[in-house]
């Protein structure tokens, strides 16, 4: 990407300083995975305040339906909890995907407490009604309760629809001592269909590269899309503004999106410095680039 894209020098200095902290040889513990569809069709950026939601990117689509939950401290019936949104469920789904792929098991051990999980993901940990612990708990609960339909090309021009709830079992319990943090179980279990699909379609990436952008969902999505798309290009790919808007715009109008997208792309590019990207009068040109994770280090080939 040309230096002229860095319109404000402070941006480049900030992002480069954050990324420089991770400049050490790539090792297996740095490699995480995500289902390829989730690197092309993304969760909402903000709370859509609806119970159904769909995002499309070319031949692939993902449709979400809010799941039902019940708080054991309440006598009320189950209720729809809402759809996951923002950066936190993106980080969590990457974590459970990484564990499943590396261990080759649908049963995934997780950290003993929510705060340990958050620190492992690089998130700040604050308590209170408006603290990060409560928001993290809510987003992960929304994600694990959500029903997914993954849609992609099928045989003879058809489209295949795979309905799945990625997590088969996930229990959160609430201690009677209010001074004790909300605890997590020692493991979760993915559904068989989702696990098999993940093994076949896992995209590797360097988790350290997410650290500078982990609080910005749109930059995370752009980075993950770049990591799976650019190494597979055999010729330059021009994406015009309407297509980019459909992919990454979310609820933004096209005009606002065109103002904001360059900043998010700069951030993602600094986390993937080998990505070859050029400005174009109608959008951006993407070119074949070295993968951020060499094939020799990939757990599933």
Sequence positions of predicted segments:
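Charged, alpha-helix-forming regions
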Residues: 1-301
């Amino acid at each position: 990407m040309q230096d002229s894209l860095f319109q404000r020098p402070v941006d480049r200095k900030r992002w480069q300083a954050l990324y420089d902290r991770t400049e050490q040889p790539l090792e297996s513990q740095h490699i995480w995975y995500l289902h390829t569809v989730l690197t092309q069709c993304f969760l909402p950026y903000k709370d859509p305040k609806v119970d159904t939601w769909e995002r499309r990117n070319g031949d692939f689509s993902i449709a979400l339906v809010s799941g039902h939950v019940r708080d054991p401290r309440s006598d009320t019936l189950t209720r729809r909890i809402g759809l996951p949104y923002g950066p936190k469920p993106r980080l969590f789904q990457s974590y459970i995907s990484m564990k499943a792929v590396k261990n080759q098991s649908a049963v995934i051990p997780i950290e003993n407490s929510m705060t340990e999980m958050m620190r492992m993901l690089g998130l700040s940990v604050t308590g209170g009604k408006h603290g990060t612990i409560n928001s993290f708990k809510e987003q992960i609960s929304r994600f694990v309760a959500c029903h997914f339909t993954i849609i992609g090309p099928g045989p003879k021009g058809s489209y295949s629809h795979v309905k799945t709830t990625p997590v088969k079992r996930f229990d959160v319990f609430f201690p009677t001592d209010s001074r004790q943090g909300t605890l997590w179980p020692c493991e979760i279990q993915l559904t068989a269909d989702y696990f098999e699909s993940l093994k076949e379609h896992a995209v590797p990436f360097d988790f350290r590269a997410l650290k500078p952008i982990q609080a910005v969902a749109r930059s995370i999505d752009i980075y993950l899309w770049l990591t799976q798309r650019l190494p597979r290009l055999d010729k330059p790919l021009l994406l015009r503004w309407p297509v980019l808007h459909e992919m990454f715009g979310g609820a933004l109008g096209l005009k606002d999106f065109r103002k904001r997208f360059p900043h998010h792309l700069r951030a993602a590019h600094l986390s993937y410095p080998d990505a070859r990207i050029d400005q174009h009068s109608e959008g951006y040109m993407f070119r074949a680039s070295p993968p951020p994770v060499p094939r020799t280090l990939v757990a599933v080939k």
